[in-house]
Amino acid sequence: MSAAEIKDKVYDIIVSKMGVNKDQITPESKFADDLGADSLDTVELIMELENEFGVQIPDEDAEKIGTVQQAIDYIVNKK
């Protein structure tokens, strides 16, 4: 899976899980500040990313993923 495909899939997951429009999402979007995620939303999002991409994201790594681009980069580096 290419980085572009991963980005598209991450965006789709964010739209599905967080109820935002795709045009509201940028690589710099912060899950909490810009997209309105609370801590439960963030946990659910991380779990969905793990399921979708077949990666394990330890809690200490998940805490460092605060933006859309950080999530994409993490998955690209794990694939």
From Swiss-Prot:
<feature type="modified residue" description="O-(pantetheine 4'-phosphoryl)serine">
    <location>
        <position position="39"/>
    </location>
</feature>
<protein>
    <recommendedName>
        <fullName>Acyl carrier protein</fullName>
    </recommendedName>
</protein>
<comment type="function">
    <text>Carrier of the growing fatty acid chain in fatty acid biosynthesis.</text>
</comment>
<dbReference type="InterPro" id="IPR036736">
    <property type="entry name" value="ACP-like_sf"/>
</dbReference>
<dbReference type="GO" id="GO:0009245">
    <property type="term" value="P:lipid A biosynthetic process"/>
</dbReference>
<feature type="domain" description="Carrier">
    <location>
        <begin position="4"/>
        <end position="79"/>
    </location>
</feature>
<dbReference type="GO" id="GO:0000036">
    <property type="term" value="F:acyl carrier activity"/>
</dbReference>
<keyword id="KW-0963">Cytoplasm</keyword>
<keyword id="KW-0443">Lipid metabolism</keyword>
<keyword id="KW-0444">Lipid biosynthesis</keyword>
<keyword id="KW-0596">Phosphopantetheine</keyword>
<keyword id="KW-0597">Phosphoprotein</keyword>
<dbReference type="GO" id="GO:0005829">
    <property type="term" value="C:cytosol"/>
</dbReference>
<dbReference type="InterPro" id="IPR006162">
    <property type="entry name" value="Ppantetheine_attach_site"/>
</dbReference>
<keyword id="KW-0275">Fatty acid biosynthesis</keyword>
<dbReference type="GO" id="GO:0000035">
    <property type="term" value="F:acyl binding"/>
</dbReference>
<dbReference type="InterPro" id="IPR003231">
    <property type="entry name" value="ACP"/>
</dbReference>
<keyword id="KW-0276">Fatty acid metabolism</keyword>
<dbReference type="InterPro" id="IPR009081">
    <property type="entry name" value="PP-bd_ACP"/>
</dbReference>
<dbReference type="Pfam" id="PF00550">
    <property type="entry name" value="PP-binding"/>
</dbReference>
<dbReference type="GO" id="GO:0016020">
    <property type="term" value="C:membrane"/>
</dbReference>
<comment type="similarity">
    <text>Belongs to the acyl carrier protein (ACP) family.</text>
</comment>
<comment type="pathway">
    <text>Lipid metabolism; fatty acid biosynthesis.</text>
</comment>
